[in-house]
Amino acid sequence: VLGSRGSVIPLFRKQIEAGGPVTVTDPEMTRYFMTIPEASQLVLQAGAMGNGGEVFLLDMGEPVKIVDLAKNMIRLSGFEPDKDIRIEFTGLRPGEKLYEELLTAEEGTNTTTHKKIFEAALEDVNQEWLSREIDRFESCKSDLDVINVLQDIVPTYHPNHNV
């Protein structure tokens, strides 16, 4: 959300004011951006639509390359990227992703009465299976046991190696 705590824009602004460099994680990194008023309005509208138990997804628009955002902010500040102010690539930190993964219609979302709010098509959870998996977690004796159970349940899970 633009202007929120943790947003990259205030960081880039400070780095530009200091003469650089502007730090970008990776040249291919993308993120979605939305203004605080737009995000607030959509969250409130989704809340008003809900009856309980639904999962709503917001249309975040198109992803923006962070390096393009950095270059545009440098230009808008009256400088030339990589000439007046350098862009430095810092590399991914543990757990950080190049892009945000959002559900799409093909992956199970349904339209709602609002064109920017979608509802996730959730499958019923097998209560027997869930109970068994909770028991497995409760019997874990170490962090490594927890990681192993998680990897069994979620094959795409890759732990942070600092754990």
Indicate residue ranges for each PLM-predicted region:
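Strand-loop microenvironment adjacent to phosphate/nucleotide-handling motifs in alpha/beta enzyme folds
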Residues: 1-163
